[in-house]
Amino acid sequence: FVMYSVYKTNRLFNHFMNVLIEYNTTMQPSDFNIDIPTESIAQKPLKDRSSSKLLHLKDGSINDQNFSDIPKLLDKHDLLILNNTKVLPARLFGKKESGGKVEIFFERLLNEMSFLAQLKFSGKVHIGTKIIINKDTVFTIEKRDKQFFTIISDSQVMDVLHSSGLTPLPPYIKRSPNSEDRDRYQTIFAKKEGAVAAPTAGLHFTTDILDQIRKMGVSIGELTLHVGAGTFAPLRLEQIESKKLHEEYFEVDQKLCDQIEASQANNGRIIAVGTTVVRALESMMQKNGIEPISDKTDIFITPGFNFELVDAMITNFHLPESSLIMLVSAFAGRETILKSYRHAIDNGYRFYSYGDSMFIDKG
């Protein structure tokens, strides 16, 4: 307990030093810009999930490894936390009664017969516009709130998604989704449907790697955060000013809370697999402390943020000027992250959802 208290005290001191040294001005998305070559953007998954590269970042030093090495970076009593959300086939295509095409990107279920969505369309749409999905299903636009539309369906929404929906690949993957994506744009531990984007840091894990980790005495916990469509959207001015992002539903149960406390009691690290897990854990701490919770979060983690729980994270490489590159910069330092991204580009790493990964250890 004394060692852990000293550790926490040092971490708090380091946080304030970071604030004083690097984050004494308000940062803008443009401060996180880096040119990612088109050829560095992964367009499809590797044959083997765990054959991706792993950039190990610790105390500012960079080591090139493979993801299959991840067990070597973990210690007994560490707690590895996964996001068990499951990606829905959330992309639909329909047409207006006039014949104009409409692309529908599902965001969140409201009830069995209605949902929130983002739309792309030719011409105009308005309240009452009907969108024909197939001979059995017609959607009707009920209302609009900024970029989101409330849609009423004449069939159960989940049935329509599963029968007609496509895997919602990110816009930087310049191809149509195929049958392989149904499997590979999903973690092997996905359980709870609700996401419209994969928690991509988890895509690298295989059953064999998880078994190796368990045999080492490392605990594996799970939470749920349903990734929303806002994860692909550019940051808006009001988000920067309010320091709030799009809302996403998350839940943490008693079992995970018990695992967190047990790991901390044994001086283990809390290791988040992905930015979604970071957002869920730090939201829990802000709202409850280490207590079960089911809620929505709009937390916007930027440089200067005081991480209360997460000690290390596994994450993919993120879009420049995005909320996610700002989050990892808050964790490791902006210059350190930009340096590691430049190293990754120079050394042939693959970027974004189907790309390679990082293990960021604060030491």
List each language-model region with its residue ranges.
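Surface-exposed, charge/polar-rich loops and edge strands
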Residues: 20-363
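Intrinsically disordered, low-complexity cationic segments
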Residues: 6, 14, 22-23
